[in-house]
Amino acid sequence: MEAVIEKECSALGGLFQTIISDMKGSYPVWEDFINKAGKLQSQLRTTVVAAAAFLDAFQKVADMATNTRGGTREIGSALTRMCMRHRSIEAKLRQFSSALIDCLINPLQEQMEEWKKVANQLDKDHAKEYKKARQEIKKKSSDTLKLQKKAKKGRGDIQPQLDSALQDVNDKYLLLEETEKQAVRKALIEERGRFCTFISMLRPVIEEEISMLGEITHLQTISEDLKSLTMDPHKLPSSSEQVILDLKGSDYSWSYQTPPSSPSTTMSRKSSVCSSLNSVNSSDSRSSGSHSHSPSSHYRYRSSNLAQQAPVRLSSVSSHDSGFISQDAFQSKSPSPMPPEAPNQLSNGFSHYSLSSESHVGPTGAGLFPHCLPASRLLPRVTSVHLPDYAHYYTIGPGMFPSSQIPSWKDWAKPGPYDQPLVNTLQRRKEKREPDPNGGGPTTASGPPAAAEEAQRPRSMTVSAATRPGEEMEACEELALALSRGLQLDTQRSSRDSLQCSSGYSTQTTTPCCSEDTIPSQVSDYDYFSVSGDQEADQQEFDKSSTIPRNSDISQSYRRMFQAKRPASTAGLPTTLGPAMVTPGVATIRRTPSTKPSVRRGTIGAGPIPIKTPVIPVKTPTVPDLPGVLPAPPDGPEERGEHSPESPSVGEGPQGVTSMPSSMWSGQASVNPPLPGPKPSIPEEHRQAIPESEAEDQEREPPSATVSPGQIPESDPADLSPRDTPQGEDMLNAIRRGVKLKKTTTNDRSAPRFS
């Protein structure tokens, strides 16, 4: 009996020791698992980041499929849904990674320390209990042996004690066996508890993974949709066919986008605000195939079909051939606030009706006057735009005449359908003109109806001059034709030069938005340079400019003269009374960038001062004094021969048109000469109009250079009457003589500083 119990206890003890040994030997396995789980979690975090970046790119592809014409909205929608499902999978993957570190790895590391303590404690408790039970059994067994020895000696009263001792020994063995069994149970429970704990830690991780993988099942439906949408790549779906059908009959047109002609709207210059007010009308009213250089238009080179629509365009437009904005007090607002007298000015001498092919010239009395233009009198070209029916008010000085001929929407990279070279269409006028009975009568400012009915003049006019001998006149005309040809061809030379010279601003700088004073940072270096002579201060409201294309032959004669000292700009140079003619598109002199620093503009009083653009003095035509007006050339076909094909016919009114001296710079110039002194009527034989090059030469020659030898060269140009100028002076010598520079004082910071 005892041997059987002893054997059983020994087996239980061995089992316990095996269990404890297994638990202690499992620690490296748990540690390796924790290590590998940490690496997996790290890779999952990297995968989450990569998946997020991948899905961002995937979403862009889906958006592109939605917005492009080739990809339909159905494909884009399916791809978007696919991306959304993947984003949900990515979110579940992120949660799975978090659960792996929070619910499994970290708790398992903490639990392992507890497991080690419990296993050691179980082993110690088992050893203690086993030792105690063995000691008790040994003691009882020793007592039983003593009683057995006494019973063998023949003592009969010892037998009951012996039986009791044997029972105690048996009980101790049974207790030992039970103790061993309890120890084994505890060891097994502990070992099982470890796995149960591990499963409890792994369950949330598995749940997150199942949730993540559950999202994948939604991809099957989306994949089937994409397969059906892209079944036949070579067949257009109905939605794409509808795009083609919707395009029919619409006015949608486009042109290749080229580099911008102006700075951005945040740093745009003088024409930004004015052009932003009419950018919608101007973009819709351009002729087909042409481009707009409006700086505030979002699509700068957008064209529309004029044949389908002819909307009303604002009279204040961005002048393309001068680069300045015609300022209209009623229609547009200047980028910089002007003084109260600023509405009575033209910023460049460019007519508000620059899109029309004719100019309505009011009576040339003393002072400025508003002039109403009835819409019924307009005779636009095929490509011109009808003006509004209401009257536009602008002021035109006596002696100013708008002569710009190039439409502002013209694409300067190539000539338009109506922009033939002027030299091919000029006709020489050698016939004498008949006397004009209206030439001697003074015209006052009280006759706007007469101006509305009679003053139908084309933009390109010639300046009336004294009669010259036929041979000299022919030679001058030859020179004029050569010069005008150089100007005309130079205008169409390249889009770069025309953009630089015509748009009025070349690069984005930090100069005030109203100024034109900049040395371009691009290749072409167009600068604005004043060559004004003596001037008076009672004509400050005229805003004038004078530019010459850099590559023209005219500018070469002034190049050496201006090499020494030149300002970077004369955008703020004040203009005063003097025989000046302003030609916005054609007077910039080409040169290398000046070393003189440009002075920035300051403010005086409450608002900024008006911008005074450069002017060039011009020799007053040599005609006798006239009491109040300039002579008017008669109507006739010979006047028509001086214009380009765009010019309408002259002589619309029943009476002679009051003329103003102006120069036609190959259809690009507008003239703002000041009011001349009273002049008497001149005979008809003296009303032989000189060609445009003579007016150009007169514009280049300061009055001080054209006085007779008996006059003092330093005399004020205003004091020189037209009769003081010699009539027979050679125009070629006048060109060679060049331009005299005169120092002027101004408080405008953008004005040049002459040392």
UniProtKB/Swiss-Prot annotation:
Q: Which GO terms describe its cellular component?
A: actin cytoskeleton; cytoplasm; cytoplasmic side of plasma membrane; endocytic vesicle; ruffle
A GO molecular function held by the record: phospholipid binding
Stretches of Low complexity bias are at 443-453, 608-623
Q: Which Gene3D superfamilies match?
A: Arfaptin homology (AH) domain/BAR domain
Q: Where in the cell is it found?
A: Cytoplasm, Cytoskeleton
Q: Where is this region: Disordered?
A: 139-159, 255-305, 327-351, 428-470, 490-513, 563-755
Specify where it is mainly localized.
cytoplasm
Q: Which residues carry this modification: Phosphothreonine?
A: 258, 425, 603
Domain WH2 residues, every copy: 727-744
The UniProt entry's GO biological process terms, in alphabetical order, are:
actin cytoskeleton organization; adherens junction maintenance; cell adhesion; cell surface receptor protein tyrosine kinase signaling pathway; cellular response to fluid shear stress; epithelial cell proliferation involved in renal tubule morphogenesis; glomerulus morphogenesis; microspike assembly
| Parts forming coiled coils | 108-155
Q: Which residues carry this modification: Phosphoserine?
A: 261-262, 271, 322, 644, 647
Write down the CDD domains for this protein, in alphabetical order.
I-BAR_IMD_MIM, WH2_MTSS1
User: Which tissue types show expression of this protein?
Assistant: Expressed in many tissues, including spleen, thymus, prostate, testis, uterus, colon, and peripheral blood.
Which family does the record claim for this protein? Belongs to the MTSS family.
The written remark on domains in the entry is: The WH2 motif at the C-terminus binds to actin monomers.
From the Swiss-Prot or TrEMBL record, give the protein name: Protein MTSS 1
Gene name of this polypeptide: MTSS1
